[in-house]
């Protein structure tokens, strides 16, 4: 399993208590993919630029898609640009992929049996491993989860590459929150105009 998949599992597990913002999760999943691709030697970081290496299969469908979508010509993409491009709809892609491989199921409605409810994790080795990584306070997974709004920042030191990626993830999540707040303010102002205030 990958850090991105473990993060998706942790987020689905957490969603039973408090829903995780999908945009934030998509951005952090894209950051987790960068870190997984770094570990797989599919890319290297030059400052905040992503330089692709020779593609090699990782065994994970979504991670292989991520590696194939790396910009392979100069000027190479920055981590932040990657987060916004790759992150679009990524949380839904991970939920669908987890369901495809049998790690989640959709609960059925009691009154209308054809209607599907929320996505729920099944007991599996992948879920147990993700929970163990989180409980052990694995620094990268903990930092990514914190960026998505799940838990606190890790106390342990991170590698320079991880710090670079996590800083970009944090900036992107803050930018997304600013856009959300601006939209709420604009909508409230528009409503006030219609009410005559």
PLM regions with names:
Residues 1-85, 192-197:
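Short, amphipathic alpha-helical interface elements at domain boundaries
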Residues 34-37, 98, 141-146:
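Short, structured motif recognition centered on aromatic/hydrophobic residues
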Residues 41, 102, 148-152:
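Short glycine-centered helix-capping/turn motifs at secondary-structure transition points
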